[in-house]
Amino acid sequence: MPAIEIGRICVKVAGREAGRKCVIVDIIDENFVLITGPKSLTGVKRRRANVKHIEPLDKVIDISRGASDEEVLRAIANAGLTEFMKEIVKPKLVPV
């Protein structure tokens, strides 16, 4: 089970969207992934994110690489995770 894979649900731990859940849509390279909330559901807009700024969760949805926000919304609804995605997680502060 790879931690960083397409369809993996994650929590943003850094930035203005910290604590919000998102879905990995594409893997750009070993340091960056393309994520989306989608914005209409979680408030996280589609963007590139550093893998150090996301925390993978144990849930995975079935989407294709580069899926649109509408396809991601459908996959979340089919998996019954709509309410789970709306919940905001308090990020864990780790001393540097």
Curated annotation (Swiss-Prot):
GO molecular function term, any single one: RNA binding
Pfam family, one: KOW
GO terms under biological process: ribosomal large subunit biogenesis; translation
Gene3D superfamilies referenced in this protein's UniProt entry, alphabetically: 2.30.30.30
GO cellular component: cytosolic large ribosomal subunit
Cystine connections: none
Keyword annotations of the record: Ribonucleoprotein, Ribosomal protein
Keyword Ribonucleoprotein set for record: yes
UniProt record similarity statement: Belongs to the eukaryotic ribosomal protein eL14 family.
Alphabetized PANTHER family for the sequence: 60S RIBOSOMAL PROTEIN L14, LARGE RIBOSOMAL SUBUNIT PROTEIN EL14
Protein name (Swiss-Prot/TrEMBL): Large ribosomal subunit protein eL14
Protein species of origin: Staphylothermus marinus (strain ATCC 43588 / DSM 3639 / JCM 9404 / F1)
Gene coding for it: rpl14e
